Amino acid sequence: PRVSHEEMYKFIEEDLNNAEKYIVNLTDTKGKVLPSLGCVYGLKARLYMWNEEYAKAEEYARKAINAAGVSPMTEADCTSYTKGFNDISKWMWGEQLTSESDQVKTGIVNWVSWLSNQTTFGYTGVNSSDMPFNMIDRSMYDRMSDTDFRKYMYKAPEGSSIASKNIYIPSIKDLCNKYMPSYASLKFRPANGNATDSQAGAASAYPVMRVEEMY
């Protein structure tokens, strides 16, 4: 049988208390690939939310924010066609792939190939209208305000007053206009906006923990 909520809570809290105590011995996070003290605080904030200890959750979320050393991503950060959601420096904790990573060498079995619609390689992409696309539905899209820049990370329907807010990778802009359906994600960009070379474009980063989660 599964353990109780209380048992699991105590187990996780003990682990995180030890992490908070000993993580000072980790002097190199490998460019945020390994967690920092701020990440431990963030995990504790999540734990206390799960246990409905909201005062503690707030306390540790604030500690995470103060220790993070990063600010919430701006509109320019999020919509950049070269750095949009592929820059580990913007997050508290992430994974960084390089051209030497096994996942990148496969050409297709990697984050960008699965998540980025703006490539001509991988499982999603703009090679044709038959390709699968990561997207949201109209209901979710319509719930976002037209002044909320997060909405600009999804392709606006034809004739929309905010269509000009969508920023495409220039080398494949025509393909995006031709094949990409409305509400398709523009969020995760290939590295440096390289949409055609999998060895370069897939050498990207993806987030594990963001400071925005703490607000």
Regions found by a protein language model. Give the residues of each.
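Aromatic-anchored glycine-rich loop motif in surface-exposed flexible loops
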Residues: 1-30
